[in-house]
Amino acid sequence: MKRYREKGIGQKRLSCIIGINEREGNPMKVVAFNGSPNKEGNTYCALKMVADELEKEGIETEIIHVGNHVIRGCMACGQCGKNKDEKCVFGDDGVNGWVQKMKEADGILLGSPVHYSAIGGTMKSFLDRTFYVASKNGGLFRHKVGASVVAVRRSGGIPTFNQLNNYI
């Protein structure tokens, strides 16, 4: 830590460098979401590579596989905004639990394979619902660090990457 201070790096920046959550003094946490239907396919491998690097810096990571779940799309019914309970009214899948994990994390990492120059349908449904709930409940994910990872074979990587980045 001393060498960072000698270089004139402030405490806030120092906390980011060494992976310390400045609010609580706890290790930073990143939650990663694998939007691939294949649990340990190329998207998982890319997320795992990022997670391994984060863990080397003392940042806890968890990879959650959402790509093989049946997740209904957002209907923009607005009930999550009316209820103000940080939950989607469709509670029959894992989305509400994942919203809370994203809220508690310091960073969010999204990963998807390329499906016809876009993210897969399950990932789209998941992201639409989680970010709609977040926006209707006071911006639950505001001020969080976000990043995206795309697994691509030939083409369509840039539109898919842009689509993920539009959420974060």
Show which residues each predicted segment covers.
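Short, Lys/Arg-enriched N-terminal segments with co-localized hydrophobic residues
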Residues: 11-27
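N-terminal beta1-alpha1 ligand-phosphate binding loop
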Residues: 29-57
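Cofactor-binding loop segments of dinucleotide-utilizing enzymes, especially the Rossmann-like FAD-
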Residues: 33-35, 66, 150-153
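A short beta-strand-loop structural module common to alpha/beta enzyme folds
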Residues: 59-69
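Cysteine-cluster motifs in flexible loop/terminal segments that predominantly coordinate metals
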Residues: 69-102
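Helix-loop-strand module that forms the ligand-binding subsite of alpha/beta enzymes
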Residues: 89-168
